């Protein structure tokens, strides 16, 4: 329950400085228990729990073979229950100060989950050091490939499917917009995302597939057909484009996914050689580097768009929000 408690709107522990906000998160409050007036909180609670698991699982891949279960459990609680939720409260809610003041935009979690978890993993790797045998006596890195390429393939295709499910879950349907939107007496269907901007399931699916395709293509080229990096790059392409995939043109999604993969791949091996960082499954590259690059690209490509569209009575006018910009 900590994740929704931290990032749930203007009454959240992080986004609200009121001393009375804590009353909403005691065990007897409506937000923390089932009640007849609750239609969606349980769904979001489960979703935020899943995101917490995701953040912890990203870290787990990077640190394999060098950490005890107890130590990893502590780190999983830190990243899964605290750090990513603070960032989400600030930049992944339409009432967050990063949206209103800085023009931050991250529709499908390039930064609030992937870049944060990748950066967290990088910090741990600096402390842990490399696996035994990863580097030669002269300091040259050895390539320790996956034990079973078939399991790598199956696992990454399952991740693709789950990621698309996350996209679809973020596409929240709205029926009968009501008189406040000038739709009185009219049953009108639309959908929105976490920033309350209009989206369609077909649009975000197309962008998802285009960024996935761009990532796979770029990964195949830069890795010269290496199966591990080809499939991992498909995920990196989606992560890179996810920050703005609610507003990108499909061709933009594909190109941005390709750019993110090239940068993540090159950065992985440069950091490995320069700083002797042993990122076992490429988690820092695929999630951290690609996610951060995606945020920067989003600021340039969507420069001038409202960071969020929520405005009662006007729907998507963005009048109370800073525009998306490269520095946001």
Task: Indicate residue ranges for each PLM-predicted region.
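Glycine- and aromatic-enriched membrane alpha-helices
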Residues: 1-328
């Amino acid at each position: 329950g900590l994740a929704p408690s931290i990032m749930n709107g203007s009454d959240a522990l992080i986004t609200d400085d009121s001393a009375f906000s804590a009353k909403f998160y005691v065990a007897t409050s409506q937000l923390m228990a089932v009640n007849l007036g609750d239609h969606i909180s349980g769904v979001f609670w489960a979703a935020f729990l899943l995101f917490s698991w995701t953040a912890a699982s990203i870290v787990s891949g990077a640190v394999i073979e060098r950490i005890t279960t107890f130590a990893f459990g502590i780190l999983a609680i830190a990243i899964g229950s605290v750090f990513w939720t603070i960032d989400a409260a600030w930049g992944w809610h339409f009432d967050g100060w990063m949206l209103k003041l800085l023009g931050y935009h991250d529709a499908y979690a390039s930064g609030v989950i992937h870049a944060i978890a990748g950066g967290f993993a990088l910090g741990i790797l600096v402390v842990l050091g490399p696996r035994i045998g990863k580097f030669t006596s002269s300091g040259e890195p050895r390539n320790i490939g996956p034990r079973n390429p078939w399991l790598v393939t199956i696992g990454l295709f399952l991740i693709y499917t789950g990621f698309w499910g996350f996209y679809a879950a973020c596409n929240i349907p709205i029926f009968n917009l009501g008189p406040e939107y000038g739709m009185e007496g009219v049953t009108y269907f639309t959908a929105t995302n976490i920033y309350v901007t209009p989206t369609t399931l077909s649009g975000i699916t197309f962008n998802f597939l285009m960024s996935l395709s761009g990532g796979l293509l770029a990964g195949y080229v830069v890795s010269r057909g290496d199966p591990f990096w080809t499939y991992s790059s498909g995920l990196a392409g989606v992560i890179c484009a996810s920050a703005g995939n609610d507003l990108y043109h499909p061709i933009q999604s594909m190109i941005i996914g390709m750019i993110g993969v090239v940068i993540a791949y090159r950065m992985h091996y440069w950091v490995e050689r320069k700083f002797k960082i042993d990122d076992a499954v490429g988690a820092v590259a695929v999630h951290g580097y690609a996610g951060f690059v995606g945020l920067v690209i989003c600021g340039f490509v969507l420069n001038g768009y409202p960071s969020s569209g929520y405005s009662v009575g006007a729907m998507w006018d963005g009048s109370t929000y800073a525009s998306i910009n490269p520095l946001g």
